[in-house]
Amino acid sequence: MDEFVRRHGATLRIAGMHGTPAQARRSGYKGGMKSIDTLTPCPCGNPAGYSRCCGLLHDGLAAATAAQLMRSRYSAYVLKREDYLLASWHADTRPASLRLAAQQPAPTWLGLEIRQQRQIDEDHAVVEFVARYRLGGGRAQRQHETSRFAREDGRWYYVDGELKS
């Protein structure tokens, strides 16, 4: 990997804000050690790149809005960051596991569109979105959902969602 970085000038994030993998383990970080080329646009669609967008949230920064959390959760699905998805899911509705690695066929995520975001009050919000994906070699499909979010202790959490037809 070091040779790839020297040749291509790419910066890779491995342990995120925790520093080296050893420092991450000492700090109690239990997430997967994922890597992504920071020159690549963020999976949520932001051309600024993963390290300046959803990567910051995946590394522990709190989302400023429910829509920002929604985008980071979409990116986590793309990157199979089950650790982040579960950590950003409200404790009252969080499943024990998502089993993303066992999904067959695994979805190929094609894009995210935030249709509407509405602040209910200071600590509750609703985000309507469409996520496009493909299963195996099949045709593209859409997941159109209205999701509810709650903020506790300054952090937004996904509560639940309602699929739309």
Q: Which stretches of residues belong to each language-model region?
A:
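Short Cys/His-rich zinc-binding micro-motifs
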Residues: 38-48
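Short, aromatic-enriched amphipathic alpha-helices that serve as compact interaction elements
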Residues: 64-80
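Short Cys/His-rich micro-motifs in 6-15 aa windows
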Residues: 56-65
